[in-house]
Amino acid sequence: MRKGTVKEVLAKIKYDPRENENDYYLIIEHRGDYGNVKKIPVNLIELGHGYFFVGETQIPYHRILKVVRKDGRVIWESRKIRK
C-alpha cells in the first residue's frame, strides 16, 4: 500500500507518466450512508483542493474509502477501514 494522503496518491496516478489512470478506481462512501458504496474510475475524476470532481459533482476526499488497481490490489485505504 502506498504511503501519503489520498490526494497525493491520486495525483501520482493521474500525473505520473509511468502510471495509467485507466488501471485504477475509487471506492467511495456514497451520500454518507454507512455501507452504501460506489465505484468510480480514476480517469473520470478531476482533482481539486479539498474535493475531487466527477463532472460537475463535487465530492470531498474524506469520502474515499479505497483506491484500488484493476487487478484488485488496494493502493490506499482510509483509516476508517483499517480500524
From Swiss-Prot:
The lineage of its organism: Archaea, Methanobacteriati, Methanobacteriota, Thermococci, Thermococcales. It comes from the Archaea. Belongs to the UPF0248 family. Coiled coil: none annotated. It holds the Pfam family MJ1316. This is UPF0248 protein PH1212.1.
